[in-house]
Amino acid sequence: MAPSDVVAIVRDADKAADLAAKGVEVRVADYADTDALGKALVGVDKVLLISSNEVGQRFAQHRNVIDAATSAGVLYLAYTSITKATESSNPLAPEHQQTEEYLAASGLAHTVLRNNWYHENYQAQLPAIAESGVLAAAAGDGKVAAASRKDFADGTAKVLTTDGHEGKVYEFTGDTALSYADIADAFGQVTGSEVVYQPVTAADVVAAMVQAGLDEETAGFVAAIDTSIAEGTLDLVDSILGQLIGRPTTTLVDVLRAA
């Protein structure tokens, strides 16, 4: 697909300058401005709705995009959700479930792409773990079947540019579910020193983050993600992502080395 066949709808055009330089048409619209969304979607056949990052506002924002797409005559929409969205205790899941349900009721032809965790989520911890030799989390014995952002992006592009995906719910995961002991080992391979996993309580996570300067509400949210991992919310392994991209998914070690 040529860049000129792609439209990127963004809130800040400056942040899409690299896309514009490649020949992608950049249009500006805010999630809250349904009129602008409708105008931005004129002439668009397929939409990729990447879930927003404003927790607590996400469903309303997603709903506006779905409504605008319907009004603009969009033929198909793919939405990036989360693993086990309809049964997950992950605090991120409820708004994804609401969006999935709203999309299903909209009448739009669609595909749900339930993305597992990103390996890149661990990159920011690398300096501290290299110094301490400890990976502390309230994830218990839970496992995470993460993949790289490029893996998810390549799989998504395949769905958008090939036929046969309408009405499907794809669980996009890495090829392997890693325990936090496995994740600690991956850190060790990259740092060249032993890294051990130290299970802690959710209260410990909150206390450590508050001490580091994070507000208590956000710290509690992060701790709740940890405890949901302990409950198995991200342990699902499905082969569909690897099948679509035609290769093994990227390893955590490779992503950490690229940090």
Q: What is each residue range found by the language model?
A:
Residues M1-D18, A32-V44, N53-R63, D67-Y76, ...:
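Oxidoreductase cofactor-interface core, primarily capturing Rossmann-like NAD(P)-dependent enzymes
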Residues A203-A259:
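A hydrophobic C-terminal alpha-helical subdomain
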Residues E25-V28:
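Conserved SAM-binding strand-loop segment of SAM-dependent methyltransferases
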Residues I50, T80, G246:
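Residues lining the SAM
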